[in-house]
A protein has these predicted regions:
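Single conserved hydrophobic/aromatic residue that forms the stacking wall/gate
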Residues: 1-7, 11-12
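Conserved short histidine dyad/triad with adjacent acidic residue
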Residues: 15-30, 74-76
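Glycine- and acidic-residue-biased ligand/ion/polar-headgroup-sensing regions
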Residues: 21, 32-51
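Histidine-centered metal-chelating micro-motifs
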Residues: 24-26, 45, 69-70, 76-81, ...
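Short glycine/proline-enriched turns and hinge-like loops at secondary-structure junctions
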Residues: 29-31, 84-85
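Short acidic-glycine-tyrosine-enriched beta hairpin
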Residues: 36, 51-79, 116-120
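Ligand-binding loop in jelly-roll beta-barrel domains
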Residues: 74-94, 98
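Long hydrophobic alpha-helical segments typical of transmembrane helices together
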Residues: 110-129
């Protein structure tokens, strides 16, 4: 997954994500912030969840969408995203507030971990990897 930060202000963050074929993002949250996601190209599957319990971890899938270009999802607290196609897909994500880490929910292990946000580029400048 290749993500580019295309804008960030005090109250909003824009992230453009390029999804290789058949790649998925794990179930994740946005540090309590809302996320709106718009499919730009390709077809993505978006599943939205609600947290029932943290210990032991229990999530309930409340929505599942197969999303063509132009589909807008949100506001979402916890979701997963998957590229269903044999081609690349892109999506634009808008967050209510900037954040540097997100929570990853592993329902098989019953764990919640934190992951630092990683970008391919920020404001059109490539990041050093």
């Amino acid at each position: 997954i290749v993500a580019s930060l295309v804008g960030s202000e005090m109250c909003i963050r824009d992230r453009l994500v390029c999804w290789p074929p058949h790649i998925s993002a794990p179930i994740h949250g946005h540090e309590g912030e809302k996320c709106w996601a718009r499919v730009q190209t390709g077809e993505l599957k978006i599943c939205n969840y609600v947290e029932i319990n943290r210990d032991p971890l229990s999530l309930e899938k409340i929505q599942e969408f197969e999303c063509p270009p132009g589909f807008l999802d949100g506001p979402a607290d916890i979701h997963s995203v998957e590229n269903l196609s044999d081609s690349f897909a892109t999506s634009l994500h808008i967050y209510a507030k900037p954040y540097e880490e997100c929570e990853l929910f592993d329902t098989e292990r019953g764990t919640v971990t934190k992951a630092k946000m990683d970008y391919h580029s920020i404001d059109s400048v490539l990041c050093n990897k």
